[in-house]
Curated annotation (Swiss-Prot):
Keyword terms of this UniProt record: Calcium, GTP-binding, Hydrolase, Magnesium, Membrane, Metal-binding, Mitochondrion, Mitochondrion outer membrane, Nucleotide-binding, Repeat, Transmembrane, Transmembrane helix
Name this protein carries in UniProt: Mitochondrial Rho GTPase 1
Binding site for Mg(2+) 1: 18, 35, 57
Biological process per Gene Ontology, one example term: mitochondrion transport along microtubule
The family this protein is said to belong to: Belongs to the mitochondrial Rho GTPase family.
Gene behind the chain: RHOT1
Length: 619
């Protein structure tokens, strides 16, 4: 909504433009009228819409055409004043003023016009019969008001309607020729309906209607008022009410009715509450609220955000199988202007074995990934879902936790983070993709079913360490000789080499020495494809000796060529190293240290599976 309103009064000489302005200010008819009134400003606290309003007078005697054109360009709304007792001034509305104004404004963004019939005290008839055909001819005319500066009739209403034409314009909402709402308005209201339909049954029940009424208008509807609304819809739309709930068709009919009855401020209140601007686009302020992220800090979803996303998942998981089918996912994203997830997402997070559909855990993981890698996009997505409205928060920023500086974690030897990034490094063909897919529980046979164009360079899943659920985010970095700064920023590094390729380990050594040897980032060497015949690596010392020399844990044997899911031991170790980068080399070598971490992972994985089964049974 505009922060202020600028009203320009134009019209033929002596129709009473200046008198109208002066009578509004002084509350009485001026005996002496100057050729032109000075610009006046009405403070926000004395206007119904609480917006400061500037009223500008135009005088043909004192101003030239260039000054008139400038005032037109600055105005938000123009009042064309005519005298009801002067036919010539009425004729000039269409022969002079409307064409002149339209020539000076863009065709796609015409200024709203108010026709003002002044001096109604001098006649006993109305000019409306003459004016109505003009209003029907020009869609930019918002309304017509007959008034009298002399007896103060309707002069306050005149400026109220002018202000309303700017703050609650009819043009973007409604097409008078077709007598129906415009497509952009229907699209916006349809999104609002889908967000408000919290149980996804295609209707707004009484609880949903009351919630909608409260968040938009700050007041609930009385039960009788609710029934009255539904009865109006029933009488006018055959399928506007179903199972005693308001359908989308009924919802759209109500807003059409509001607009037709001149109550378009009601529709605008709803649209603006859900983030729309005057062009029916979601505002940048709504989609991208301010969120300060200091250096060396990361972004995560907080508990309230996860609860919200759980409710969104439940809303669209219609068959209650704890996975979203392609149709269910498409239905979920109907409130988005585009499909945000591509086929690579299915290879980034966990899917079910039946149809390769994104599971409940995979759904939350993808949101966690987006929040960590691109928090602005996460804010945008939460905005499309209506987070701030449904969660009754000021903005989506309240869904985000900004972690503390990593240097503080190192000093205190503990972290509050829940998401840890591991960069997976290795030469092409060494098995990095296998490591990523193994995090999602996929063996080599399942990995071979992935199409090349759907490959993902990220994988994310939960890992349990000492009974704590954490997210491990794996990133397959490029296999170039020199990594970019962005490719070296992480919490832990996984150096992968192929045991069957004699040149594979040497690449890991070069990358380690160039980027990580002098850093405080812990590194773990993974001997991939351990099911194959191991050959001697073409490097001066063996991988085991290299790890010992640089105070790293010994190389971890790994293969995804298994009958069942690959082992998750390396993921527990990587997450543990990321959580406790200060742990000494002696601790890292201790079997007891890893046993405690792995035991916690096993216990909580079992508990998680039991809770998952209970959830399915309960639902």
């Amino acid at each position: 909504m505009k922060k202020d309103v600028r009203i320009l009064l134009v019209g033929e000489p002596r129709v009473g433009k200046t008198s109208l302005i002066m009578s509004l200010v002084s509350e009485e008819f001026p005996e002496e009228v100057p050729p032109r009134a000075e610009e006046i400003t009405i403070p926000a606290d004395v206007t119904p819409e609480r917006v400061p309003t500037h009223i500008v007078d135009y005088s043909e005697a004192e101003q030239n055409d260039e000054q008139l054109y400038h005032e037109i360009s600055q105005a938000n709304v123009i009042c064309i004043v005519y005298a009801v007792n002067n036919k010539n001034s009425i004729d000039k509305v269409t022969s002079r003023w409307i064409p002149l104004i339209n020539e000076r404004t863009d065709k796609d963004s015409r200024l709203p016009l108010i026709l003002v019939g002044n001096k109604s005290d001098l006649v006993e008839y109305s000019s409306m019969e003459t004016i109505l055909p003009i209003m029907n001819q020009y869609t930019e005319i918002e309304t017509c008001v007959e008034c009298s500066a002399k007896n103060l009739k309707n002069r306050s209403e005149l400026f109220y309607y002018a202000q309303k034409a700017v703050l609650h314009p009819t043009g973007p909402l409604y097409c008078p020729e077709e007598k129906e709402m415009k497509p952009a308005c229907i699209k916006a209201l349809t999104r609002i309906f889908r967000i408000s339909d919290q149980d996804n049954d295609g209707t707004l029940n009484d609880a949903e209607l009351n919630f909608f009424q409260r968040i938009c208008f700050n007041t609930p509807l009385a039960p009788q008022a609710l029934e009255d609304v539904k009865n109006v819809v029933r009488k006018n739309v055959s399928d506007g009410v179903a199972d005693n709930g308001l359908t989308l068709k009924g919802f759209l009919f109500l807003h059409t009715l509001f607009i037709q009855r001149g109550r378009h401020e009601t529709t605008w209140t709803v649209l603006r509450r859900f983030g729309y601007d005057d062009d029916l686009e979601l505002t940048p302020e709504y989609l991208f609220p301010l969120l300060k992220i200091p250096p060396d800090c990361t972004t995560e979803l907080n508990h309230h955000a996860y609860l919200f996303l759980q409710s969104i998942f439940d809303k669209h998981d219609l068959d209650r199988d704890c996975a979203l089918s392609p149709d269910e996912l498409k239905d979920l994203f109907k409130v988005f202007p585009y499909m945000p997830w591509g086929p690579d997402v299915n290879n980034t997070v966990c899917t079910n074995g039946k149809g390769g559909w994104i599971t409940y855990q995979g759904f939350l993981s993808q949101w966690t990934l987006t929040t960590y890698l691109d928090v602005q996009r996460c804010l945008e997505y939460l905005g499309y879902l209506g987070y701030s409205i449904l969660a009754e928060q000021e903005s989506q920023a309240s869904a985000i936790t900004v972690t503390r500086d990593k240097k503080i974690d190192l000093q205190k030897k503990q972290t509050q983070r829940n998401v840890f990034r591991c960069n997976v490094v290795g030469m092409k063909g060494c098995g990095k993709s296998g490591v990523l897919q193994a995090l999602l529980g996929r063996n080599l046979m399942r990995q071979r079913q992935i199409r090349a164009e759907h490959k993902s360079y990220y994988a994310i899943n939960t890992v349990y360490v000492y009974g704590q659920e954490k997210y491990l985010l794996l990133h397959d970095v490029s296999d170039s000789e020199f990594l970019t700064d962005a490719e070296t920023i992480c919490d832990v590094v996984c150096l992968v080499y192929d045991v069957s390729n004699p040149k594979s380990f040497e690449y890991c050594v070069r990358i380690f020495k160039q980027h990580f040897m002098d850093s405080r980032i812990p590194c773990l060497v993974v001997a991939a494809k351990s099911d194959l015949h191991e050959v001697r690596q073409e490097y001066s010392i063996s991988p085991a000796e290299f790890c010992k020399k640089h105070k790293m844990p010994p190389p971890q044997a790994f293969t995804c060529n298994t009958v069942d899911m690959p082992s998750k031991d390396i993921f527990v170790k990587l997450t543990t190293m990321a959580m406790y980068p200060h742990v000494t080399q002696a601790d890292l070598k201790s079997s007891t240290f890893w046993l405690r971490a792995s035991f916690g992972a096993t216990v909580f994985a079992f508990l998680g599976f039991a809770m998952y089964k209970a959830l399915i049974k309960q639902r």
